[in-house]
From Swiss-Prot:
UniProt record similarity statement: Belongs to the RNA polymerase beta chain family.
GO cellular component terms listed in the entry, alphabetical order: DNA-directed RNA polymerase complex
Pfam families: RNA_pol_Rpb2_1, RNA_pol_Rpb2_2, RNA_pol_Rpb2_3, RNA_pol_Rpb2_45, RNA_pol_Rpb2_6, RNA_pol_Rpb2_7
UniProt subunit comment: The RNAP catalytic core consists of 2 alpha, 1 beta, 1 beta' and 1 omega subunit. When a sigma factor is associated with the core the holoenzyme is formed, which can initiate transcription.
UniProt protein name: DNA-directed RNA polymerase subunit beta
Gene that this sequence comes from: rpoB
Length: 1342
């Protein structure tokens, strides 16, 4: 494989034995594709906005004389870009304009004669747009819409598994779930009658539904039963014989024909008997007359003369009835065929409990159940039933629902109507009865073929449709009012309901979540998350174990490892690396096709439904050079996901990759295969909580997934087109695009502006740092600048730390960690956190609040960091309690005495009627002010500071645009120069001439002249574009801000806090090995090796065996080897050894082991080898892909190559005494993360503060500035010690003795340290509670 210039800077050695068949797909596809389908630049009418409009329009008035038709829609351009929306706190959205046509028909002329047509563009609110990285900016914050895993529409057959009824009888049920509309359930009761429920209301006999569908009793029986025909011949009774029906029954009489006895009475009828009957062609058999008793008539028998019904359908036949029928001249009687085994009489029994007798009574019954208390009329009852399942407006199975419905019932076609038909309902009942009769299986609801993904686009479309339906009602009313001559479509449509529905969904839906922006991995994982919760989904409380459990169909679709711990376990999942959704919303995963035991390059995506039919081999099955299986038997997954051994020719597909099973986060854990699943779960979850460190450090031991995640997360800057770096500084990169990638007639310059020190959602710091140098070539899609937690385009969440597994004076008891002071000094885990504090000046009833430096009763020192406008300077170092923005609020006028009024009038003292409400730094916080923004309402005069900021922004914007213009001009003029030199004008002449004049030259060649004219036009275009951009930018900066009602001004102050690591901070590895720092130890006290090199962190060896996460030990060994090789390269570089020797050593390292990666350093120039060596000095990065990683021999080989002991253990010496430790210790390099659980955020202290209203006890928690709870057990502890006075203090003055604590405070202030405890408030509360129960208690002094 050839490496590009950028890739050659640092190559990660890959231990993977299998070459990558399929590259990791773009990780945010699920979000971006879904939203693209919703917005659809060229609508197809099947989905998205277009489908929503078409489903609601045209809206016809009640009398049919006018209709409002939909023509097309257009999304405008958003006013502000993403960055501006974040700063201003607005939503990144585009206006939606819809072209509508109002058509009036002539009432007097023939139907359909058009009288008038009005067409108009109507504004229908704003649609939030998705950013390039799959997020939405709503009110200035980035949010993610999580995809939902919900039950697919269709029909499901299930059973209660014998849990409902005390007898343990299994009751079966069927449920038809539409995409929207009423649910229809059928269920058996313990007596085997079949009932129906609509929308989970009370049950009705299922035959009521059939009667409402206009079936008669005879037709119903005909649908569900086979018939038995009895013939009356004189006093004999013959039965038509179908031998197969007799199988398994016991003969109650001799079965004989033509004198031959086939089965004697009392014998069980077997297959041998049936064969004999069939062979002799026995068609009829004589039965005793009693045999017909209890059989059920299949149709009505009427007296042909009188017309009287002798025997109605579904009536049990008795001897009297038989005699009557014979008398009436009937020679053949049809009865229902039922038996106890596999043809139950369920429908027949249900008809007996059915109160209705015809269609109307059935409809009335349904109406009464759906609308209790309303008097039913025929029209209302019919309308209700029709609307329930047969109306396009009210009921929609959707394409998915119809496909699942037809597949479940074995109908060939996958398409059909969105509403139910008579046949559909009958087919569901038939299948349910078949299952009850023992034919057919119930469905597995947790199978991923029965659960589908609803992504952003689909959910937004549903919300939009809800808004449209609300509008439709209003428009219908308006159309029916008449007098439409002067009305335009704009007058009819009120866009508020639509924008309200959309806003509600994006702003406050359970699935619209505040983006987890801790680091690039947490962003990617959040966008790939799949939740079973949310509207139309499950709730935590109701979800059982089955739903949460790993299902065989999760393989390759949903990660079995990554899911939260706690109440949401198993309900929130993560998409596997290669998974995607198909058109129906079911998850698919890719497989390589296998033909006759040979694995092909062809890749097919299979959904869980299709996968069940095939046998699929694992990705680690052994193949020869012709891609044939080498083993006689191959481990593979058969039907139902069960694993087994199969012959190669039986196999249909093979997995694409070993990491296909797991999610992105789990695929980042090296040696995942050696970790216990519970710990791997913690490891995957904790990587998302890693805080980006000051300097990112790539992991020495990775898995090869680091690059795709960093690129796809969008935090790094990636080249849109290939070219050469023309200019680079901390905030901008300019690329001169390659000739073959430029569009004719453009300057061929790409400018990338970098994000500097911005706040993320989690208050971590987002900063981009260029990683290219001037003049370097870059290819398309290559990395230009690293974002937070990325290092040369690879994800770098933590730091490579030298660790030792050994106990050290109890400082690593219970997972604590002992950290060397050097880690703190080198700022390895120092992080920057940025806080946004805002101050809002509102209009109050007593007057406007004012932002000012003139604050009453505040000393000069407190105002030292404020400017004249009362706003803190950028760069000021502030600590808890400092004023950031001075603000005063008008106080209510107190009643003044006449004397005070006189003094006020004379001296005009106004200062006393305002109170200080300034924005101060929260307690316990300190930092540096890095930015201040002032937003002023339109029409309110801007203060000096706001004008300064505005001027600065204008200057910066102009400077940026001018620089951009200069760069583009330079690119353009270099082309002009080349053209003119080609055209015969000397370079000297050009150098003396002004550049603008170059464009006025005339060239002899006509083609060159036209090219020059083209370039001149381009130059004009550039200037115009520059003017336009500058004007737009200027107007955006100058215009007032759209603030909330009643808000005059908002000031936002950004504080940056640098946090070093300290005892109490939480750290973790990638294998679920988490712990808290117990002590920061001086370097000289840390254990050191023979070379005098101390370790940086000491971990407890007891944390490994019981947790079974051995991956961390292997990582430590491999990390040591990686570092060892880096050391060897470093020595060679320092000694300035021969480049060939260096090349040979590095080549040896890359060639070691049986990996599929090929790195040929002979194709590298000496300069490239040196640059590679320079980047490998600190250690050679290694990749050990999950389930396909380095084995023991490779680790040992690498350790040997690095000149290290192959045991991975080293003799250590005690830093304090210099004594050798008793035995060798495992030492190596582990990738450690600092998690976002910092002791600074948790630490909290209180002396006095707020109290709860009823109990008068201090509140709890840091956010409420609460106290420490002294609970029941703590009271026992003090009782056990007999510390009576301490206990009294705890229960009274320190808690809820109101008077006592006030006196105590006064005493402390006065310097007399004694307390006077009184009655605790909670005692009064309990007294009141007892009185509220009607028991009076009086307290008498003893």
């Amino acid at each position: 494989m050839g490496y590009s210039y950028t890739e050659k800077k640092r190559i990660r050695k890959d231990f993977g034995k299998r070459s990558q068949v399929l590259n990791v797909p773009y990780l945010l596809t699920i979000q971006l594709d879904s939203f693209d389908k919703f917005i659809q630049r060229d609508p197809d009418g099947q989905q998205g906005l277009e489908a929503a409009f078409r489903s609601v329009f045209p809206i016809v008035s009640n009398n049919g004389s006018t209709e409002l038709q939909y023509v097309s829609y257009k999304l405008g351009e958003p006013v502000f870009d993403v960055r501006e929306c974040q700063i201003r706190g607005t939503t990144f959205a585009a206006p939606l304009r819809v072209k509508l046509r109002l058509v009036s028909y002539d009432k007097d002329a023939a139907p359909g004669t058009v009288k008038d047509i009005k067409e108009q563009d109507v504004y229908m609110g704003e649609i939030p747009l998705m950013t390039d990285n799959g997020t939405f900016v709503i009110n200035g914050t980035e949010r993610v819409i999580v995809s939902q895993l919900h039950r697919s529409p269709g029909v499901f057959f299930d059973s209660d598994k014998g849990k409902t009824h005390s007898s343990g009888k299994v009751l079966y049920n069927a449920r038809i779930i539409p995409y929207r509309g009423s649910w229809l359930d059928f269920e058996f009761d313990p007596k085997d009658n079949l009932f129906a429920r609509i929308d989970r209301r009370r049950k009705l006999p299922a035959t009521i539904i059939l009667r409402a569908l206009n079936y008669t009793t005879e037709e119903i029986l005909d649908l569900f039963f086979d018939k038995v025909v009895f013939e009356i011949q004189g006093d004999k009774l013959l039965m038509e014989l179908v031998p197969e029906r007799l199988r398994g029954e016991t003969a109650t009489f001799d079965i004989e024909a033509e004198g031959k006895v086939y089965v004697e009475r009392g014998r069980r009828i077997t297959a041998r008997h049936i064969k004999a009957l069939e062979k002799d062609g026995v068609k009829k058999v004589e039965v005793p007359t009693e045999y017909i008793i209890g059989k059920v008539a299949a149709k009505d028998y009427v007296d042909l003369e009188s017309g009287e019904v002798i025997c109605a359908a579904n009536t049990e036949i008795s001897l009297e009835l038989l005699a009557k029928l014979a008398q009436a001249g009937y020679t053949a009687i049809e009865a229902l065929f039922t038996n106890d085994l596999d043809f139950g009489p369920y429908i027949s029994e249900t008809l007996r409990v059915d109160p209705s007798c015809d269609r109307l009574s059935a409809l009335v019954e349904i109406y009464r159940m759906m609308r209790p208390g309303e008097p039913p009329t025929k029209e209302a009852a019919e309308g209700l039933f029709d609307n329930l399942f047969f109306s396009q407006e009210r009921y929609d199975l959707s394409a998915v629902g119809r496909m699942k419905f037809n597949r479940s019932l074995g109908i060939d076609s996958e398409t059909g109507s969105g509403v139910l038909s008579k046949e559909d309902i009958v087919s569901v009942m038939k299948k349910l009865i078949d299952i009850r009769n023992g034919r057919g299986e119930v469905d597995d609801i947790d199978h991923l073929g029965n659960r589908r993904i609803r992504s952003v686009g689909e959910m937004a479309e549903n919300q939009f449709r809800i808004g449209l339906v609300r509008v439709e009602r209003a428009v219908k009313e308006r159309l029916s009012l008449g007098d439409l001559d002067a009305v335009t479509p704009q007058d009819l449509i009120n866009a508020k309901p639509i924008s309200a529905a959309v806003r509600e969904f994006f702003g406050s839906s359970q699935l619209s979540q505040f983006m987890d922006q801790n680091n690039p991995l947490s962003e990617v994982t959040h966008k790939r998350r799949i939740s079973a919760l949310g509207p139309g989904g499950l709730t935590r409380e109701r979800a059982g174990f089955e739903v949460r459990d790993v299902h065989p169909t999760h393989y390759g679709r949903v990660c079995p490892i990554e899911t939260p711990e706690g109440p949401n376990i198993g309900l929130i999942n993560s998409l596997s690396v290669y998974a995607r959704t198909n058109d129906y919303g079911f998850l698919e995963t890719p497989y390589r096709k296998v033909v006759n035991g040979q694995v092909t390059e062809e890749i097919e995506y299979l959904s869980a439904i299709e996968e069940g039919k095939y046998i699929i081999a694992q990705a680690n099955a052994n193949l020869d050079d012709d891609f044939r299986f080498t083993d006689t038997f191959v481990t593979a997954r058969g039907e139902h996901g069960e694993s087994g051994l199969y012959r190669p020719e039986e196999i249909h597909y093979m997995d694409v990759s070993t990491q296909q099973v797991v999610s992105v986060a789990a695929a980042l854990i090296p040696f995942l295969e050696h970790d216990d699943a519970n710990r791997a779960l913690m490891g995957a979850n904790m990587q998302r909580q890693a805080v980006p460190t000051l300097r990112a450090d790539k992991p020495l031991v990775g898995t090869g997934m680091e690059k795709p995640i960093a690129l796809d997360s969008g935090v790094a800057v990636v080249a849109k087109r290939g070219g050469t770096i023309q200019y680079v500084d901390a905030s901008r990169i300019v690329v001169k695009v390659n000739e073959d990638e430029t569009i004719p007639g453009e300057a061929g310059i790409d400018i990338y502006n970098l994000i500097k020190y911005t706040r993320s959602n989690q208050n971590t710091c987002i900063n981009q740092i260029p990683c290219v140098n001037l003049g370097e070539p870059v290819g398309r899609g290559e990395i230009l600048a690293d974002g937070p937690s990325t290092d040369l385009g690879e994800l770098a969440l933590g730091q490579n730390i030298r660790v030792a597994f050994m106990p050290w004076n109890g400082y690593n008891f219970e997972d604590s960690m002992l950290v060397s002071e050097r880690v703190v000094q080198q700022d390895r885990f120092t992080t920057i956190h940025i806080q946004e504090l805002s101050c809002v000046a509102r209009d109050t009833k007593l007057g406007a609040e004012e932002i000012t430096a003139d604050i009453p009763n505040v000393g000069e020192a407190a105002l030292s960091k404020l400017d004249e406008s009362g706003i803190v300077y950028v760069g000021a170092e502030v600590k808890g309690g400092d004023i950031l923005v001075g603000k005063v609020t008008p106080k209510g006028e107190t009643q003044l005495t006449p004397e005070e009024k006189l003094l006020r009038a004379i001296f005009g003292e106004k200062a006393s009627d305002v109170k200080d409400s300034s924005l101060r730094v929260p307690n316990g916080t300190s930092g540096t002010v890095i930015d201040v923004q002032v937003f002023t309402r339109d029409g309110v005069e801007k203060d000096k500071r706001a004008l300064e900021i505005e001027e600065m922004q204008l200057k910066q914007a102009k400077k940026d645009l001018v620089e951009e213009l200069e760069i583009l001009e330079a690119g353009l003029f270099s082309r002009v120069r080349n053209l003119l030199v080609d055209g015969g004008i000397s370079e000297k002449e050009l150098d003396t001439m002004e550049r603008a004049k170059w464009l006025e030259q005339t060239l002899s060649s006509e083609s060159k002249q036209s090219r020059l004219e083209q370039l001149a036009e381009q130059y004009e275009e550039l200037r115009k574009d520059f003017e336009h951009k500058l004007e737009v930018k200027r107007s955006k900066i100058i215009q007032g801000d759209d603030l909330a009602p009643g808000v005059q001004k908002v000031v936002k102050v950004y504080l940056a806090v640098k946090r070093q690591i300290q005892p109490g901070d939480k750290m973790a590895g990638r294998h679920g090995n988490k712990g808290v720092i117990s002590k920061i130890n001086p370097v000289e006290d840390m254990p050191y090796d023979e070379n005098g090199r101390p370790v940086e962190i000491v971990l407890n060896p007891l944390g490994v065996p019981s947790r079974m996460n051995i991956g961390q030990i292997l990582e430590t060994h491999l990390g040591l080897a990686a570092k060892g090789i880096g050391e060897q390269i470093n020595i060679m570089l320092k000694q300035k050894q021969d480049i060939e020797k260096l090349r040979g050593y590095i080549q040896k390292a890359y060639d070691l082991g049986g990996g599929s990666q090929v790195v040929d350093l002979n194709t590298f120039t000496d300069e490239e080898v040196l640059r590679l060596a320079e980047n490998l000095r600190k250690g050679m990065p290694l990749a050990t892909p999950v389930f396909d990683g380095a084995d023991e021999s490779e680790i040992k080989g690498l350790l040997e190559l690095g000149g290290l002991p192959t045991s991975g253990q080293i003799t250590l010496y005690d830093g304090r005494t210099g004594e050798k430790f008793e035995r060798p210790v495992t030492v190596g390099y582990m990738y450690m993360l600092k998690l976002n659980h910092l002791v600074d955020d948790k630490m909290h202290a209180r002396s006095t503060g707020s109290y709860s209203l009823v109990t008068q006890q201090p509140l709890g928690g840091k956010a409420q500035f609460g106290g420490q709870r002294f609970g029941e057990m703590e009271v026992w502890a003090l009782e056990a010690y007999g510390a009576a006075y301490t206990l009294q203090e705890m229960l009274t003055v320190k808690s809820d003795d109101v008077n006592g604590r006030t006196k105590m405070y006064k005493n402390i202030v006065g310097g007399t340290h004694y307390m006077e405890p009184g009655t605790p408030e909670s005692f009064n509360v309990i007294m009141k509670e007892i009185r509220s129960l009607g028991l009076n208690i009086d307290l008498d002094e003893a």
